[in-house]
Amino acid sequence: MGPNGEFEFHETCPIDKLVRAENELCALIGPQKAFEMGVAGMKYAESPPGVTDIVTAMQMFDAAYHINHLENGVPMFDPETGTMREGIGHYRCLSISRHRAVMEVDVPYPCDFDRGLIQSWARRFERTALVTHLEPSVCRKNGAPRCRYEVSWK
């Protein structure tokens, strides 16, 4: 914590340690608080250039995720070249329409934390956005390799 009571992010943190800590913390605090932690964490995230509406935001979520992760001090997505480094999973926008997107997620972070991240990101662009876990039986909590979420808005 910083002097103003806000959480202070350091420029780099090894991804394996960060993921392990987040998974342990989310297991301790439970699904609702993990969701809230994801919502809060998104306020610190950098947005790729050109994201101005919810449709573009959902299509660019994976780029935003990679921009906000560093490998050897370099963002894992370069918007100027379109180069994306692998190794931390993806947030794929499988389909999108005027009021709905389906996201497939295979990142190492906890499912409930991801729901919070996605909802917070979507609400930057559309305040009515709501995230629902599709196929709850197919979930990383149960050992599945991915989760799917529906993002809907009015």
Tell me what each language-model feature is.
Residues 2-111:
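Amphipathic interaction/junction segments at domain boundaries or subunit interfaces
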Residues 1-2, 126:
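Glycine-centered secondary-structure boundary/capping sites
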